[in-house]
Amino acid sequence: MKVLLINGSSKEGCTYTALSEVARSLNEEGIETEIINLGPNAVRDCVGCGMCAKNGNARCIFDDDIVNRIIEKAEEADGFVFGTPVYYAHPTGRILSVLDRAFYAGKKVFQLKPGACIASARRGGTTASFDVLNKYFTISQMPVVSSTYWNIVHGNTPEETKQDLEGMQTMYNLGKNMAWLLKCIKTGKENGINLPENKVQRTNFIR
């Protein structure tokens, strides 16, 4: 089993430190992990062209940034952790652009796989950012993995983040909970408990 962790920061700093603690915890449980750093490179916004739906190949028509690479890796992953630093009480524009396009083009790649998000800040805005990222999971039938507190850490440097003992413990516990859920899903499949097949009904309120 494998968990894909996405660092929505341009640096390997505080958010990376928190994600690394989640990964360490998962590795202890025999879960393979991979951390992808979005880095400083530009990421396109979704332009609503609809070509991904028309092509039906779970890929974005724009293939000049990291989004399709993430979708490809997501196909092989069993769970996900998305991390973001806080910019003006909000996730980074970079990770939102990635998730908008990845979830729209490759929604079925993520469906019914466990997901979790974490937010890192010097001080405020973590819970608002945390709520925004969770929206991607809850519209995609993804079990949301929680911890012993909201998945947030505080600090302005990696060293300060490590001093947030409760925050780092929350990251470690998140990894344990993710591993437990992945093992439950695997055991269920092995014993004939199949994933649900749900119908979708759409209603437009303005006609």
Regions found by a protein language model. Name each.
Residues 119, 137-139, 156-157, 174, ...:
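Short alpha-helical linear motifs
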